[in-house]
Amino acid sequence: MADVKKVVLAYSGGLDTSVILKWLQDTYNCEVVTFTADLGQGEEVEPARAKARAMGVKEIYIDDLREEFVRDFVYPMFRANTVYEGEYLLGTSIARPLIAKRLIEIANETGADAISHGATGKGNDQVRFELGAYALKPGVKVIAPWREWDLLSREKLMDYAEKHGIPIERHGKKKSPYSMDANLLHISYEGGVLEDTWTEHEEDMWKWTASPENAPDTPTYIELTYRKGDIVAIDGKDMTPAEVLTELNRVGGINGIGRLDIVENRYVGMKSRGCYETPGGTIMLKAHRAIESITLDREVAHLKDELMPKYASLIYTGYWWSPERLMLQQMIDASQVNVNGVVRLKLYKGNVVVVGRKSDDSLFDANIATFEEDGGAYNQADAAGFIKLNALRMRIAANKGRTLS
């Protein structure tokens, strides 16, 4: 323990990380630097400063990372139309590499020997934090208290906090029965009744979205302007990336968009049920595919779709800073050069419906695609040779007596 003199802790100010703070001070006899990230989770982060100071912390970092989060992590991910296991929009996963990056930056700034986090030994986040940290600073020491201590229940954490004078709320406002994580992209719910995969989630669990049944009876129309694959304006009003996502969360939430209840495969081997609200992200995914549908070459679009599951898996499992993810990102970004234009959407009772798309870079040619007289733009007789050449290998196989049965 003597080799650790200063540790940077990813600190929320909640029970777990407050206990970790004290545990680090006592177990390692070290100085602790706290880092609290504002990723748009909708909670006040300033109380973490007062709590850390009360626990003897001299160096306290509270960083507003909302713009960086959306600009450098969420937007690049959505250029790939990223979805994990067909449904999950990776709201938790995509936040972890930014936190890891900032932990390492602060460790370098403060001369810390180690970093620490509050992720448990049963989840994905420990992997995401630590893979990111090692990629950015190979020799860094990582302290993961949940893999070391014997405080394996909430009651034990509460008892430890009371014993060491850590401010807690044992009584007071009702605590959510769920384990929750939020940022500007989503809010997640795990644990509690959700651990029974047959039990329906309770309606009052959802924080961001109206139920589709109770959403407005009149649809909402919005127009999203794209530049190189990123949304830059809503209804003609220029916005920053964080402003875009904030507004889409608002209008999507009102219309009951973005709820999800899934069982996913964790990287550490177990299956886990999670419920997610991702109103803005759900809208972004639908709209981005719509603008790509008229601006991307067919084979480029198909290749992107083939590679997307691998890209999604890299994010989910913590390999954001890996060479393979960076390589894929260069390809994805190159594909977005002509992904410009406007998408018009109708939002109604949990549904996102594309009702229009236009672009100066559109590859859609109405003169060729029309069902009416095309004035010779497309010679239908050419199709006969095209079909015969593509059928050649199957005709040869059939002539050899090969069958599909």
Curated annotation (Swiss-Prot):
EC number from the UniProt entry: 6.3.4.5
Keyword Magnesium applies: no
List of residues binding L-citrulline: Y88, S93, N124, R128, S179, S188, E264, Y276
Residues that, per the record, bind ATP: A10, Y11, S12, G13, G14, L15, D16, T17, S18, A37, G118
GO molecular function ontology, one term from the record: argininosuccinate synthase activity
InterPro entries reported in the protein's UniProt record: Arginosuc_syn_C, Arginosuc_syn_N, Arginosuc_synth, Arginosuc_synth_CS, Arginosuc_synth_type_1_subfam, AS_cat/multimer_dom_body, Rossmann-like_a/b/a_fold
Catalytic activity from the UniProt record: L-citrulline + L-aspartate + ATP = 2-(N(omega)-L-arginino)succinate + AMP + diphosphate + H(+)
Key word Methyltransferase present: no
Assigned keywords, A-Z: Amino-acid biosynthesis, Arginine biosynthesis, ATP-binding, Cytoplasm, Ligase, Nucleotide-binding
Pathway in which the depicted protein is active: Amino-acid biosynthesis; L-arginine biosynthesis; L-arginine from L-ornithine and carbamoyl phosphate: step 2/3
An annotated GO BP: argininosuccinate metabolic process
Subcellular location: Cytoplasm
S-S bonds: none
GO cellular component terms given for this protein: cytoplasm
Subunit structure, interactors included: Homotetramer.
Family stated for the protein in its record: Belongs to the argininosuccinate synthase family. Type 1 subfamily.
HAMAP family reported in the protein's UniProt record: Arg_succ_synth_type1
Protein name: Argininosuccinate synthase
Native organism: Pseudomonas aeruginosa (strain ATCC 15692 / DSM 22644 / CIP 104116 / JCM 14847 / LMG 12228 / 1C / PRS 101 / PAO1)
Lineage, uppermost ranks: Bacteria, Pseudomonadati, Pseudomonadota, Gammaproteobacteria, Pseudomonadales
Recorded name of the encoding gene: argG
